[in-house]
Regions:
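Alpha-helical elements of the RecA-like P-loop NTPase motor core of helicases
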Residues: 3, 76-77
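Catalytic loop of short-chain dehydrogenase/reductase
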Residues: 10, 14-61, 69-74, 80-85
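Conserved Rossmann-like nucleotide-binding pocket used by diverse enzymes
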Residues: 64
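Hydrophobic positions on the long internal alpha-helix
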Residues: 1, 5-9, 13, 51-52, ...
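Conserved long hydrophobic alpha-helices within structured protein cores
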Residues: 2, 20-24, 115
Length: 163
């Protein structure tokens, strides 16, 4: 889906003033932990991430291609109804954290900001956000972590830990 949708949109994006493709996909991490018990889902998400790598190189300077991924679970119907019920939903962050992060990415210069794998709260902290409490009803240490966030490559910003 990601490849086909991008392929069909590229001719139109090339005519745009500041064209971007933003995939909601994780940083690539070959830790077997992410493959065990969820191989099909992992393959699907990492496929989207590989599209970021390939398309960012192929359209360098013409179309920005980046990936955004949440550090914690996000309040969606899937979380409430499929993954974890009301408790997991309540201990997830609000979708606004992703939209605020996406807004930052989509306003970057497409010629210079491409091929990045970004974690929502890290990006927001880098751009001056200090109040992460508005994105959740529980303290950070009680939130449900999301899948695919490598522990070593994307440390939690200090301002996030404190909120």
């Amino acid at each position: 889906g990601t490849f086909l949708m991008s392929k069909l949109c590229i001719p139109h994006l090339l005519k745009s003033e500041n064209p971007h493709i933003l995939n909601l996909s994780p940083p690539l991490d070959m830790d077997p932990l992410w493959f065990q018990g969820s191989l099909a889902y992992t393959m699907a998400k990492f496929n989207m991430s590989m599209c970021v790598l390939g398309m960012a190189a192929e359209y360098s300077g013409k179309i920005a291609v980046n990936a955004l991924w949440p550090r914690t679970a996000i309040r969606t119907a899937a979380v409430a109804n499929v993954l974890g019920g009301q408790e997991m939903y309540d201990k997830s962050r609000k979708p606004e954290i992703m939209s605020d992060a996406a807004h930052i990415i989509l306003n970057k210069d497409h010629k210079t900001f491409s091929g990045n794998f970004l974690i929502d709260d890290s990006l927001l902290a880098e751009h001056g956000e200090t109040d992460f409490s508005k994105y959740a009803d529980y303290p950070f240490d009680q939130l449900m972590p999301d899948f695919f966030v490598p522990a070593d490559g994307y440390p939690v910003p200090k301002v996030v830990k404190e909120s």
